[in-house]
Amino acid sequence: MEQQSYWVQTTDQQRLYVKTWGNANNPVLVLVHGYPDNQEVWEPVIGHLVQDYYIVTYDVRGAGMSSVPRCTRAYALPQLSLDLESVVNSVIPQRSFHLVAHDWGSIQSWESATEPKYRERMLSFTTISGPCLDHAAFWMREQFKQHKPQFFKQLTKSWYIAAFQVPFLAPTVWQFFSPEHWGKVLSRLEGRSDLPLNHHIAADGKHGVALYRANFIPRLTKPRERFAICPVQAIVLEQDQFVSPALIDEMPKWAEDFQRVNVNANHWAILSQPEVIAKEIKRFVQNWRCVEAS
């Protein structure tokens, strides 16, 4: 696939590695990757979308080829939202776009999808396995009061979040992950042995831990009421071993124009079932265009 690459400077002087794919005259999709991935994780999905869309991807700070901030607070959600703004202002200035995000890419993209300044520019948001931390905090409080089994079920899926708060633990563990070792972990989760390898996995895992440390405790202890400023689609992965599908149940409270689609897949469906994920992205975007045209 033909692609071009760019360097974009952020508001705090970090450098983000950005790629664009396809015909610039097509509608724009911005894809944001999760943890411990980099933008290459989207390439299987891009292959099914590039004929119809102009696609923008980037390595989030601390991942792939992008620079690595020295302090944890540089990974806070407001700054990550500014990173997205820097990317779109540089690569697609003054153009509107559809946002699609997975895992931590989705968590950080909720910050933008609930930010009023994007109202005239962000056309839609497709979230995959990454809830808004503020919404999740309200949901967990409600579950603890009224549905404790559901609360503890999600806690068992989120054990790693507590582990990532321990200084030096996660960065040390990631040093032992080779691309092949991580590939075997993904293969067991997704039931496929032909998944592409992440050759940056040790660094991506080590540095990306700061996403958890900078955001989970502040957001879970002091959640904010944040409402979506555009139509939202949640692609719910029914076999997801890290994010409970029940977290999506409350999402209509926060998104006036909301739809949900279930996919029988595990957490990294963008790798194991890229055609299915691409189909749902395309369907949602096309439906938006039909509604807008009418």
Task: Identify the residue ranges that each predicted region occupies.
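Glycine-rich phosphate-binding loop signature in dinucleotide/nucleotide-binding domains
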Residues: 23-24, 91-95, 288
